[in-house]
Swiss-Prot record:
Gene Ontology terms: cellular component: ribonucleoprotein complex; ribosome
Gene Ontology terms: biological process: ribosomal large subunit assembly; translation
Keywords per UniProt: Ribonucleoprotein, Ribosomal protein, RNA-binding, rRNA-binding
Biological source species: Clostridium acetobutylicum (strain ATCC 824 / DSM 792 / JCM 1419 / IAM 19013 / LMG 5710 / NBRC 13948 / NRRL B-527 / VKM B-1787 / 2291 / W)
Classification lineage: Bacteria, Bacillati, Bacillota, Clostridia, Eubacteriales
Entry's family note: Belongs to the bacterial ribosomal protein bL20 family.
GO molecular function, one term: structural constituent of ribosome
Name recorded for this polypeptide: Large ribosomal subunit protein bL20
């Protein structure tokens, strides 16, 4: 079997990693081994962060809806149950936007939910 010289591929890989490590402090931006470790960690954290962002936004929307429903005299869980029973198909993002930007319309949604719960 023929000998494989990796000079071109290795240099290409090093260049790619060092380009990703641009802006890192000290040896982490200059030395391949430390840069590679930092880049791998950064990419892993970015991957995890993209998933955490979804959770964080959902938590934020729920907190906003909960605050707005309690102002109107209803708990979050009862409100969600009421709008599901009423057949209102709105996601939490839309509901939180309405709660912030149009409180009057949101209070009407709360009233609809209350009627469905009591019916």
């Amino acid at each position: 079997m023929a000998r494989v010289k990796r000079a071109v591929n290795a240099r290409k890989n090093h260049r790619k990693v060092l380009k990703l490590a641009k802006g890192y402090y000290g040896g982490k931006s200059k030395l391949f081994k430390t840069a590679n470790e930092s880049v791998i960690r950064a990419l892993r954290n970015a991957y995890v962060g993209r998933r955490l962002r979804k959770r964080d936004f959902r938590k934020l929307w729920i907190a906003r809806i909960n605050a707005a429903t309690r102002i109107n005299g209803l708990s979050y869980s009862k409100f969600i149950n009421g709008i599901k029973l009423a057949g209102i198909d709105m996601n939490r993002k839309m509901l939180s936007e309405i709660a912030i930007n149009d409180p009057k319309a949101f209070s009407e949604l709360v009233e609809v939910a209350k009627k469905q719960i009591n019916a």
